[in-house]
Amino acid sequence: MSKGFTLEKNLPHQKAGVDAVMNVFVSATPHLTDNVAVRLLANPELKLSEQQYYNNIKNVQAFNGIAHSKDNHNAKSNIIDVSMETGTGKTYTYIKTIFDLNKSFGINKFIIIVPTLSIKAGTVNFLKSDALKEHFRDDYKRELRTYVVESQKNAGKNTKSYMPQAIHDFVEASNFNKKYIHVLVINSGMINSKSLTDTYDTGLLDNQFNTPVDALRAVKPFIIIDEPHRFPTGKKTWENIEKFNAQYIIRYGATFSEGYKNLVYRLTAVDAFNDDLVKGIDAYIEDIVGDGNANLKFVKSDGKEATFELNENNNKKSFKLAKGESLSKTHSAIHDLTLDALNKSTAVLSNGIELKIGSSINPYSYDQTLADNMMRKAVKEHFKLEKELLTQRPRIKPLTLFFIDDIEGYRDGNDISGSLKTKFEEYVLAEANELLKTEQDAFYKNYLEKTVTNISSVHGGYFSKDNSDKDDKIEQEINEILHDKELLLSLDNPRRFIFSKWTLREGWDNPNVFQICKLRSSGSTTSKLQEVGRGLRLPVNEYMCRVKDRNFTLKYYVDFTEKDFVDSLVKEVNESSFKERVPSKFTQELKEQIMAQYPELSSRALMNELFNDEIIDDNDNFKDSDAYSRLKSKYPAAFPIGVKPGKIKKATDGKRRTKMRVGKFSELKELWDLINQKAVIEYKINSESEFLSIFKSFMLEETERFTKSGVHTRIDKIYIHNDMAMSKSIVSDDDDFAKLNTMSYREFLDNLSQTIFVKHGTLHKVFCDIKDTINITEYLNIQTIRKIKSGFSKYLLNNSFNKFSLGYNLISGSIHPTKFTNADGNPLGEVLSSDLGVLQDNAKAPLDTYLFEEVFYDSELERRNITDREIQSVVVFSKIPKNSIKIPVAGGYTYSPDFAYVVKTAEGDYLNFIIETKNVDSKDSLRLEEKRKIEHAQALFNQISQSVKVEFRTQFANDDIYQLIKSALP
């Protein structure tokens, strides 16, 4: 199990957000303050003329396709806005921006402002994590030093008052030591605290400042605001933020409720869903059948009593309730709901809902049966998903989050019949025991046994009142939920169900939340996107690596009062989009996009039309600013608006399926059974010495990949130039490097051996043989192990069939069920259309010999194969579904071809073809890894051909499938 998340570098959507901010400061120059006492403690001031600032923002907006309008731009404001949808990594994006601002301009002090304690906890954990430190260390040679402002106990009357320690340390931290970037984290509650404006007995910055806010202002901070919609301008918190007099305020969020100041980058919800940067969403809506149309309205109040009117089946009744009374008095369906607070205009219920006079609730949404059904369904679906994800390799541990308002029923429900906790544990035990009857997977069986043995260990909760609770068990639960994601996701930890009121509704998230169940409506105006955001991130596997090679879905459970949840969410997603980027040139990608939807157009005809309509010029550039808009109007089917169908749907919508022409399957069956045989790759390395030679070659060729473990001194010299203090760095030579290993040689060998499955003795011998070139004892760290693993896997792939040969061993045994067949080997009537392709051509029918009734494809080349030019000799052909056939290749990778053809020759013989489509001009255009994978496929089908002949061919962009098959016929 990994001890930290594996962070990915240079993800395009995150890099674009960083670049957008950095390009705002093109031509900016840093200047140190004249105040000698502050000079080494404050940020340099970035000097940028108003005109340059304006031009930079205009250029960045143009590059990112953002309209340069008054809605997106205010040249007088020092606020820069970055809009990124929930779950796409905005925290990582602003942290990388911090590193880049430091690297480019020496900005060394940042204040991160967050709205809530839960968000603060998550942010601080990430900032202090070893994974983050290691991730940025190579590129920047810097580390973050994090200071957290916490609430203080009041000092006694005769006690000397001291400034908050975090602020003191942050302000007084010297920039002379360039190793550290200083980051102060503070939540909105502390921003408004007196502790920031009080005068203290001890001052800062050579006793020039006795109040924290003045001292913070003096260091000329850069401020980063997380969740800007929680900091409305004109309110007290924003006014206090402005007192810091930041050089620039950079706001990161998915929601900007008051609009933008200077919007430089936006990753919309549409982008996030369409580009598979987040999970899709299935909503499970619990409907009431029968008497569900009841309405309980809050009609009036004198401040002491509230009057409610029940309207059910056209019968009206009035009820008066005082503070503390249960609403079960008004309707038998209501449970665990009381009137908590009351004035003349507002009634506050115990679940946090505020009712204004005239507003109402549906009593049946508080019915215990409804809540029980939702909880039972969520538990059942969790175990179905868990069985799938924990019996695969690598494993993924799913979590389920419950939002409840019956806190007592959860916290105090032990051994109380009918309590929320008791019922939940009964549901879990029932599902776990049922699975144990048949489970064969050893790991998952043990996991289920631990569940049954200690049922209380599978769940935990976090509620706002827990912050004052001293119970050790509760503290452990909170620590896992708020502070230690890795521990919560550990396969050794059976906890996978989390309960909260609404405390975790915003800011908190965990990538492995696959289900969110709202047992009670929150009554909140929080956006639907914010609510689902707790589970939108793509999951990580047991090694803490993000899993991106398949589509995942977040299941969201709501009751019938939110029956329009999906419609509202889709509307919100699409309304959150903004003007798309306008390209300057008609690209090959745009051409393929249009031709995919208008297959009757040839490439030449399309280009002629665009030229004649004066949309493009001789060089394929768009002729004017309206040309792209005219292009979209001319070919609307190629430019769909909004989120793709199916990315957000009701669970009852079902997945799109396409019908198989079952009668044709018998002709394909022999080939289908052949290619579905399991195969094991065999490295034909004949001796230990031969493997030693290969691994040694890799190590010698990849020396530059490794980073030494140790301390390297860099000397920063301060000098005077034009009456201004400046600094320059002098990099010391290698003699100044002090080795500092993070693990022993033995630990390194153990870890590396387990990671790449090579014997200790082999590794030790190689390291001894190459010690004159690279002394591995200088590189004893986890980063070296990771680089050896990834590098050696790629090295094996790239050098297969070159430095060593390969073979395949076919494994006999049952292959069914498959993507095309059931457990008995009989053909399925239909398959998931997404397994055949993400694009659909409704304009053309597939060829008669095609296995399916509809055309689903992934590239124009595939579409042509399916719809164009019937080949007389072809008996049947089919797209090979995604992930149905995984050919093992060297280095632990897999490979999947695209088409299967059965051909009948003039002599009456049957020939089998497997086709790989590559939408490039020739083999020369392929990357080395792709070439090697194709060679692996060729080797496998050569092996299969010893019993039944199977021809493997690669089809390039200009290859006609007819000619390709014809050339292989005898």
From Swiss-Prot:
Its cofactor is Mg(2+); S-adenosyl-L-methionine. It is an enzyme of class 3 (hydrolase). Residues 75-540 are annotated as: Helicase-like domain. GO terms for biological process: DNA restriction-modification system. The keyword Nucleotide-binding applies. Residues 894-918 are annotated as: Endonuclease domain. The keyword Aminoacyl-tRNA synthetase does not apply. GO terms for molecular function: ATP binding; DNA binding; helicase activity; type III site-specific deoxyribonuclease activity. It catalyses: Endonucleolytic cleavage of DNA to give specific double-stranded fragments with terminal 5'-phosphates. Its EC number is 3.1.21.5. Keywords: ATP-binding, DNA-binding, Endonuclease, Helicase, Hydrolase, Nuclease, Nucleotide-binding, Plasmid, Restriction system, S-adenosyl-L-methionine. AMP binds at T91, G122, F126, D226. Gene3D superfamilies: P-loop containing nucleotide triphosphate hydrolases (3.40.50.300). A heterotetramer with stoichiometry Res(2)Mod(2). A heterotrimer with stoichiometry Res(1)Mod(2). Has a helicase-type domain in its N-terminus and an endonuclease-type domain in its C-terminus. AMP lies in a cleft in the helicase domain. Belongs to the type III restriction-modification system Res protein family. A type III restriction enzyme that recognizes 2 inversely oriented double-stranded sequences 5'-CAGCAG-3' and cleaves DNA 25-27 base pairs downstream of one site. DNA restriction requires both the Res and Mod subunits. DNA topology affects its action; relaxed and negatively supercoiled DNA are digested but positively supercoiled DNA is not a good substrate. Interacts with DNA approximately one half-turn downstream of the recognition site. This is Type III restriction-modification enzyme EcoP15I Res subunit.
